[in-house]
């Protein structure tokens, strides 16, 4: 006789079958992402001087908005930052922009002084006489004369530096230091006003690389309209007016009219 084989028929209940089938039919969570938008971030750095001048620097970079995603297991939300640069490099770029701003303020270092800013202006005396620069025989000479209302005034380019001299209480300095200027005719900015300490005159000299110490003058703000220029190399000596000419004047009384000048923007 052949051996009789036994077969087991295991039955699954309809309820259990429907539950297992339901689990198989549940679709997995899909990753959903919100629309990414690129934004531009701009950092503005400002330095306001006591003299009223404002130094402004802007730096900008691009970054994308945070993007949402869903976890496959827990279904919880996560946020990821997508930017133009990784986080570390973004920090480095921001630090670099700050350093670039500091470098822009200290772009030109001349004999231990740092250029802050520069601007053109017309220069006139206390008695409304204009300071002009006339080309004679291939060289510029300085004239001080009366100018008509309709006559165009010459301009000078003033370069502002931080002076090592401590500032007074008159508010003519920045960060506890006085301001110092170097002046050139706007017609030729390679020429500087130069204090000749031998014959106490003011001359125009052309330089090759950087201005000498005789070309720097400490700026004193006398009022809202007038300033005076003290020679850096000759403390107590100012640019003044003598016989309708610019000259060096030793003046103990800083309120003397012949050392006061008016700077006007045209």
Swiss-Prot record:
<dbReference type="GO" id="GO:0002826">
    <property type="term" value="P:negative regulation of T-helper 1 type immune response"/>
</dbReference>
<dbReference type="GO" id="GO:0030225">
    <property type="term" value="P:macrophage differentiation"/>
</dbReference>
<keyword id="KW-0964">Secreted</keyword>
<dbReference type="GO" id="GO:0002686">
    <property type="term" value="P:negative regulation of leukocyte migration"/>
</dbReference>
<dbReference type="GO" id="GO:0032755">
    <property type="term" value="P:positive regulation of interleukin-6 production"/>
</dbReference>
<dbReference type="GO" id="GO:0043032">
    <property type="term" value="P:positive regulation of macrophage activation"/>
</dbReference>
<keyword id="KW-0804">Transcription</keyword>
<dbReference type="GO" id="GO:0032436">
    <property type="term" value="P:positive regulation of proteasomal ubiquitin-dependent protein catabolic process"/>
</dbReference>
<dbReference type="GO" id="GO:0005125">
    <property type="term" value="F:cytokine activity"/>
</dbReference>
<dbReference type="GO" id="GO:0002638">
    <property type="term" value="P:negative regulation of immunoglobulin production"/>
</dbReference>
<dbReference type="GO" id="GO:0002639">
    <property type="term" value="P:positive regulation of immunoglobulin production"/>
</dbReference>
<dbReference type="GO" id="GO:0000122">
    <property type="term" value="P:negative regulation of transcription by RNA polymerase II"/>
</dbReference>
<dbReference type="GO" id="GO:0010186">
    <property type="term" value="P:positive regulation of cellular defense response"/>
</dbReference>
<dbReference type="GO" id="GO:0002112">
    <property type="term" value="F:interleukin-33 receptor binding"/>
</dbReference>
<comment type="function">
    <text>Cytokine that binds to and signals through the IL1RL1/ST2 receptor which in turn activates NF-kappa-B and MAPK signaling pathways in target cells. Involved in the maturation of Th2 cells inducing the secretion of T-helper type 2-associated cytokines. Also involved in activation of mast cells, basophils, eosinophils and natural killer cells. Acts as an enhancer of polarization of alternatively activated macrophages. Acts as a chemoattractant for Th2 cells, and may function as an 'alarmin', that amplifies immune responses during tissue injury.</text>
</comment>
<dbReference type="GO" id="GO:0097191">
    <property type="term" value="P:extrinsic apoptotic signaling pathway"/>
</dbReference>
<dbReference type="GO" id="GO:0106015">
    <property type="term" value="P:negative regulation of inflammatory response to wounding"/>
</dbReference>
<dbReference type="GO" id="GO:0010560">
    <property type="term" value="P:positive regulation of glycoprotein biosynthetic process"/>
</dbReference>
<dbReference type="GO" id="GO:0120042">
    <property type="term" value="P:negative regulation of macrophage proliferation"/>
</dbReference>
<keyword id="KW-0158">Chromosome</keyword>
<feature type="propeptide">
    <location>
        <begin position="1"/>
        <end position="101"/>
    </location>
</feature>
<keyword id="KW-0968">Cytoplasmic vesicle</keyword>
<feature type="site" description="Cleavage; by CTSG and ELANE">
    <location>
        <begin position="101"/>
        <end position="102"/>
    </location>
</feature>
<keyword id="KW-0202">Cytokine</keyword>
<dbReference type="GO" id="GO:0005615">
    <property type="term" value="C:extracellular space"/>
</dbReference>
<feature type="region of interest" description="Homeodomain-like HTH domain">
    <location>
        <begin position="1"/>
        <end position="67"/>
    </location>
</feature>
<dbReference type="GO" id="GO:0010467">
    <property type="term" value="P:gene expression"/>
</dbReference>
<feature type="region of interest" description="Interaction with RELA">
    <location>
        <begin position="66"/>
        <end position="108"/>
    </location>
</feature>
<dbReference type="GO" id="GO:0050729">
    <property type="term" value="P:positive regulation of inflammatory response"/>
</dbReference>
<dbReference type="GO" id="GO:0045944">
    <property type="term" value="P:positive regulation of transcription by RNA polymerase II"/>
</dbReference>
<dbReference type="InterPro" id="IPR053902">
    <property type="entry name" value="IL33_C"/>
</dbReference>
<dbReference type="GO" id="GO:0045348">
    <property type="term" value="P:positive regulation of MHC class II biosynthetic process"/>
</dbReference>
<dbReference type="GO" id="GO:0032736">
    <property type="term" value="P:positive regulation of interleukin-13 production"/>
</dbReference>
<dbReference type="GO" id="GO:0032722">
    <property type="term" value="P:positive regulation of chemokine production"/>
</dbReference>
<dbReference type="GO" id="GO:0010628">
    <property type="term" value="P:positive regulation of gene expression"/>
</dbReference>
<comment type="subunit">
    <text>Forms a 1:1:1 heterotrimeric complex with its primary high-affinity receptor IL1RL1 and the coreceptor IL1RAP. Interacts with cargo receptor TMED10; the interaction mediates the translocation from the cytoplasm into the ERGIC (endoplasmic reticulum-Golgi intermediate compartment) and thereby secretion.</text>
</comment>
<dbReference type="Pfam" id="PF15095">
    <property type="entry name" value="IL33_bt"/>
</dbReference>
<dbReference type="GO" id="GO:0032760">
    <property type="term" value="P:positive regulation of tumor necrosis factor production"/>
</dbReference>
<dbReference type="GO" id="GO:0038172">
    <property type="term" value="P:interleukin-33-mediated signaling pathway"/>
</dbReference>
<dbReference type="GO" id="GO:0140367">
    <property type="term" value="P:antibacterial innate immune response"/>
</dbReference>
<dbReference type="InterPro" id="IPR026145">
    <property type="entry name" value="IL-33"/>
</dbReference>
<comment type="function">
    <text>In quiescent endothelia the uncleaved form is constitutively and abundantly expressed, and acts as a chromatin-associated nuclear factor with transcriptional repressor properties, it may sequester nuclear NF-kappaB/RELA, lowering expression of its targets. This form is rapidely lost upon angiogenic or pro-inflammatory activation.</text>
</comment>
